[in-house]
């Protein structure tokens, strides 16, 4: 557990039908690390206001506000009741990326959770919001398969760009791994000379490491390995010394 204060877990939701899976998994993670959960949704203003008349536009915003509030509260309430954990739902209208950036700066979460979109081709960072968050948020990011089961014991965990020794600031990773399926899949992109000398993280048990040389298709290859090994929860751990390949994901 984090010293003094609870971990702040921020779940970014698009309120699609499978959003409940992402939120359920996030709340289970929060329970393991004794964290608190914020649920955040942004609706494009252009999707709400389509009338040129000011009065009609204001009425449309008000109607959408009530509808989104009801939907968000329903989602948070249903998961909160099942998992017995408080979820704070918040939403806003405007530019999606700007609103997310502002919310992150204001609330200062420790962990940001996003759902990984379904795709015919495996895509590690296919959604435009994911690379944006990776660029703007320097904390730790959880990418959760939207098809995942909410029970953390049934999860298959992957680590991307993890350091050789997961430090104490990342102790929540150890808590989650302890409840997940084994082995953990660790993915890293590195120079050939570095890759030849690297091995498994000695602080983690039952880790299968995949080290790829730097090249244009490295992330695509990792994505294929994720799909093959059915990894449905990926930890993206960034440090100040993060390599150009990792920061280049954005």
Feature-to-residue mapping (PLM):
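Short active-site-adjacent structural elements
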Residues: 48, 220-221, 242-246
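A short, acidic, amphipathic alpha-helical segment used as a generic capping/interface helix at domain edges
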Residues: 215-227
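Small/aliphatic-rich secondary-structure junction motif
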Residues: 2-56, 154-212, 231-233
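A short acidic, glycine-rich active-site loop
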Residues: 57-70
